Amino acid sequence: MKKVEEKVILFIEKHRLIEHGDKILVALSGGPDSVFLLHFLQKYKKKYDAEIAAIHINHKLRGNDANEGEKFCKSYCGALNVPFSCVGVDVDSFAKKNKISFEEAGRILRYEIIENHCRKIGFNKIATGHNLTDNSETV
């Protein structure tokens, strides 16, 4: 086992983040944090008798790059044999309608969709690749 994986397992167990039989929905952006998270959880799901699925939110703000990100996430989940869902949202319209920033609109829509999907598929936990340096999400 790699040192980083050992540290993650110790952190999970110290803080009781995963319990036996959890069903965990991973918010998969396609960035390195969420990709590592999905890979790690899929690799160690038997240790926790956990079920893993992933969801990708296409904010449709980056043109073809957004579609490529969606394709990557779908392909990666296929390679890992992880159930995958993708939802497209119109962040621009939501932001304008509610007179808020794109960032705030994206965050509101993203978490609403993820939480609803988690309930819909009967999962009990959501995992994100968010970290302390992701200032726009921390604030």
Which residue ranges define each predicted feature?
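Core alpha/beta nucleotide-donor-binding catalytic domains of modification enzymes
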Residues: M1-L28, P32-V139
